[in-house]
Regions:
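N-terminal Sec/SRP start-transfer signal
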Residues: 1-2
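Central hydrophobic cores of alpha-helical transmembrane segments
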Residues: 7-12, 182-197, 212
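Secretory targeting signals
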Residues: 12-75, 103-178
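Juxtamembrane "helix-exit" motif on the non-cytosolic side of transmembrane helices
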Residues: 21-23, 199-202
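Helix-loop-helix units of permease transmembrane domains in multi-pass membrane transporters
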Residues: 76-109
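Membrane-helix interface segments
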Residues: 94-96, 100, 182-186, 206
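Membrane-interface transmembrane-helix boundary segments in multi-pass integral membrane proteins
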Residues: 202-212
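Junction motif at the cytosolic side of a transmembrane helix
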Residues: 211-233
Length: 233
């Protein structure tokens, strides 16, 4: 597992979150980081930290999920397959042990980066955005905390969906490496899969993700074995 690629993934997630639109000023959409560092207090008063987190989670972040999943598989290409270093690992641990370890590396890199990136963003908005709305003298009391709690619970459920979705894309991307070591193909194909299936899969039950993960893993595992069946394990 390459720590540099994981760090790159985390930076991508955090940057996408901070650059997401959160309000308007003079008819122009402003991002989260602009609201914080340019002092748009009129926007911040009407946006709680739970709002800021949920807006990003329900926004266009899912469009970048294939990139996060694809980058997780790049160390396999760059560090091993294209330099033939994988023969060393085959002789040391065997092909049948090497393949599951690479799948596990991709899943941890993709899912872990998304989770850590969102955690860092959550800490950021918790520090710089209020916990309750500020409507001045007309502020409504009594429902804010309950609304925030429901919003957080809903966001947590959706976050679980996103993590499962990234796990599925990571498994798919790792299996794709067994077919081609072309970096551009491995980056682009998950985007095509995401474009075709995102609106369907993001509204399904979690067990569908698990079934697809098993399907993609079994298919990719067989492809890896076929590719290196002549290699002594």
């Amino acid at each position: 597992m390459n720590a540099g690629f994981i760090l790159l993934n985390i930076v991508i997630v955090l940057a996408l979150c901070l650059c997401s639109g959160i309000g308007t000023v003079n008819g122009r959409t402003v991002s989260v980081i602009e609201v914080v560092f340019k002092g748009y207090d009129n926007v911040r008063k009407l946006v709680t930290w739970a709002d800021a987190f949920s807006v990003v989670l329900y926004g266009h972040l899912y469009l970048a999920l294939p990139l996060i999943a694809s980058i997780a598989s790049l160390p396999i290409i760059c560090d091993e397959l294209r330099t033939n270093n994988f023969y060393f690992h085959f002789s040391r641990i065997g092909v049948k042990h090497y393949i599951p370890l690479k799948y596990l590396s991709c899943i941890v890199s993709g899912v872990g980066a998304l989770f850590l990136g969102l955690i860092l963003y959550g800490v950021f908005v918790r520090l710089f955005f209020p916990s309750s709305y500020d409507f001045g003298d007309s502020q409504v009391i009594g429902i804010i905390e309950n609304n925030s709690l429901r919003m957080i619970m809903s966001a947590a459920g959706y976050l679980l969906y996103m993590l499962c979705y990234v796990a599925m894309l990571s498994i798919f991307s790792c299996g794709l490496v067994s077919v081609t070591q072309n970096i551009y193909v491995n980056l682009c194909v998950p985007f095509l899969l995401n474009y075709v299936t995102s609106h369907i899969l993001l509204n399904t039950k979690i067990y569908v993700f698990l079934l697809l993960c098993v399907l993609f893993y079994c298919t990719g595992y067989r492809l890896w074995l076929l590719k290196y069946k002549g290699v002594r394990a």
